[in-house]
From Swiss-Prot:
Biased composition (Polar residues): 9-18
Species in which this protein is naturally found: Drosophila melanogaster
Pfam families assigned to the protein according to its UniProt record, in alphabetical order: PAP2
Designated name of the protein: Putative phosphatidate phosphatase
Protein family according to the UniProt entry: Belongs to the PA-phosphatase related phosphoesterase family.
Length: 379
């Protein structure tokens, strides 16, 4: 019996060491298991985070592309609107200028001056015919080439001086049309020359209306017309002395049809009105725009020379027997008053600085808020 007990005890002892029960050396470490599980969960989380991050980046890139596309479309739309606005403004200016100048062409081609009578013994109508001292090409040079050239030179110099002062960073010099940045001098020349041309056309139209409405005879009327009365008599016959002659025809030997028409257009003087408008306006322009620290007298000398050009032109019309002195005076007043009105009330030469831009600027300026908008001062 005791032996049996020993055997059973041995079996029991052996059963405790069977492979079905792991020994302490073979038991896994709980820390390693926890670490492994933690690493597995971390890998899963990192994978999920990477997938989410990639998804967010893709969405952001798509949003950026959409935003860039919308911005480009918006920019293109604003650019097209800006170009259209500039074209409409320029086209409207040209149309208005043509409308104002068209009646002058009609007067020249189709206009008929008022038929005024005369006295055969009127000494003011018996002067000989002379060619003009100031020819037409000289008149056009005085009234067109000189003002345009002076305005161009002054505006270019002003623009260069501004560029030097601003070191190329001046925002007021940015004008964009058809994706081309227009310089400031070009815009200013367009404004100044356009307004000058508008004023010159109106001054000439005012003069022509008076010419064709009054029909005053020129001092060389008798020499050019060589009038013959209905009964065949002339001014050399005594029966016509002291008579006011209304019914007559012009023999006009050696006179062209244009000369026979021009002999009735004495009042007011067109040469005087045109040159005085051009030179007075140019003097006012220099007063407002020309600033040279070298010598203040240079500006006033140029102004004096320009006025003297107009003064000489007006005097030559009397000495050439093209006009009576009152015709020249009236023409000079029309031109001078027109220049004063245009310079002070039509142009911006003497206006206070204005913060409203004349032309549309860049796309950034179009999108800028009122507080951030770039303003331009015109002077």
């Amino acid at each position: 019996m005791p032996a049996v007990k020993i055997i059973m005890s041995t079996e029991t002892s052996a059963s405790e060491t069977t492979p079905l029960r792991r020994s302490e050396n073979e038991t896994p470490d709980h820390k390693e298991l926890a670490q492994s599980n933690s690493n597995s969960r971390q890998t899963t989380v990192n994978s999920n985070n990477n997938n989410y991050s990639n998804s967010v980046q893709v969405r952001l890139q798509e949003q950026d592309r959409d935003s860039d596309s919308e911005q480009q479309q918006h920019t293109a739309t604003i650019t097209m609107d800006t170009n259209k606005r500039i074209l409409c403004r320029v086209g409207l200016d040209v149309l208005i200028l043509l409308c104002a100048g068209f009646p002058i062409l009609l007067f020249f081609l189709l206009g008929e001056p008022y038929k005024r009578g005369f006295f055969c013994d009127d000494e003011s109508l018996k002067h000989p015919f002379h060619d003009s001292t100031v020819r037409n090409w000289m008149l056009y040079f005085i009234g067109a080439v000189i003002p345009v050239g002076v305005i161009f030179i002054v505006e270019v110099i002003i623009s260069q001086n501004k560029a030097k002062q601003d070191n190329g960073n001046a925002t007021s010099r940015r004008y964009v049309f058809m994706n081309y940045e227009l310089p400031d001098w070009m815009i200013e020349c367009y404004k100044k020359i356009g307004i000058y041309a508008f004023g010159a056309v109106l001054s000439q139209l005012t003069t022509d209306i008076a010419k064709y409405s009054i029909g005053r005879l020129r001092p060389h009327f008798i020499a050019v017309c060589q009038p013959q009365m209905a009964d065949g008599s002339t001014c050399d016959d005594a029966i016509n002395a002291g008579k006011y002659i209304q019914e007559f025809t012009c023999k006009g030997v050696g006179s062209s049809a244009r000369m026979l028409k021009e002999m009735r257009l004495s009042f007011p003087s067109g040469h005087s009105s045109f040159t005085f408008f051009a030179m007075v306006y140019l003097a006012l322009y220099l007063q407002a725009r020309m600033t040279w620290r070298g010598s203040k007298l240079l500006r006033h000398l140029l102004q004096f020379l320009f006025i003297m050009v107009a003064w000489y032109t007006a005097l030559s019309r009397v000495s050439d027997y093209k006009h009576h002195w009152s015709d020249v005076l009236a023409g000079s007043l029309i031109g001078s008053i027109s220049a004063l009105v245009v310079a002070n009330y039509v142009s911006d030469l003497f206006q206070k600085p204005n913060t409203k831009p004349y032309l549309a600027r860049t796309v950034q300026d179009m999108n800028a808020s009122p507080a951030q908008a770039i303003t331009i001062t015109t002077n």
